[in-house]
Regions:
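Membrane-topology segments of multi-pass transport proteins
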Residues: 13-175
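Transmembrane alpha-helix signature in integral membrane proteins
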Residues: 179-202
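N-terminal signal-anchor/first transmembrane alpha helix
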Residues: 1-12
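Glycine-rich, histidine-containing beta strand-loop boundary motifs that form or position
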Residues: 8, 25, 198
């Protein structure tokens, strides 16, 4: 009986927890316009760093306009409303990508963004159309758009390495949360305790 209970417990943990190791991503073609990101055109890192996430947001919105037109998607959403299916960390992710390799400026790149937690929940079955009737976070029109993007393979669920390696996230972007940094901190704390314990014991 104890073995059976253990099997049930492990099965429950796996069935409830495996979704955490998958996250929903959307792949967009982003034109990294030089005039927006490097006005002087000299690839000076200090100057490019002055472009905040607000400077990257219009590039993401523009990519949605291009996508909707290119794929003939049926939606009444503006590019601003459509881009809200992305995580609030999207502009920051794109900015970090550019700062790591300034040579991408002026190119059109294929970039994977996290969707927001509501879209992720919808594709994992936690969020339904019925449950969002009075929600300000997601609309039926956005879910219609998501369904079309899933059919096209533009939105997919993939292994969430960020969950294993990332740091904690704010309430505004829970989809970007991870426990990697916490694990490192816990490891060093245990190491310190172990060292102190050995010295005191000796």
């Amino acid at each position: 009986r104890q073995l059976l209970m253990l099997v049930v417990l492990i099965g429950t943990i796996l069935s409830k927890g495996l979704n955490a190791f998958q996250q929903t991503f959307i792949t967009l073609e982003i034109e990294l316009i030089e005039a927006k990101l490097d006005k002087k055109g000299n690839r000076d890192l200090a100057n490019i760093k002055k472009v905040t996430t607000f400077g990257y947001t219009p590039l993401i919105k523009k990519s949605f306009e291009v996508l909707i037109s290119k794929e003939n998607l049926v939606t009444d959403l503006s590019s601003k409303s459509a881009s809200k299916v992305l995580s609030k960390s999207a502009a920051s992710e794109l900015r970090n990508f550019v700062l790591k390799d300034l040579n991408v400026i002026g190119q059109t790149v294929s970039f994977e963004f996290l969707t927001n937690s509501w879209i992720d929940g919808y594709l994992k079955g936690r969020v339904t159309r019925g449950s969002i009737k009075n929600s300000k976070n997601v609309s039926p029109e956005q879910l219609d758009l998501v369904d079309q993007l899933v059919e096209l393979g533009i939105i997919k669920k993939k292994c969430n390495l960020g969950f294993l390696l990332g740091s904690d996230a704010s309430d505004m972007r829970p989809e970007a949360a991870g426990f990697g940094v916490s694990m490192v901190g816990s490891f060093y704390m245990l190491l310190v305790v172990l060292i102190l314990s050995i010295r005191i014991g000796v």
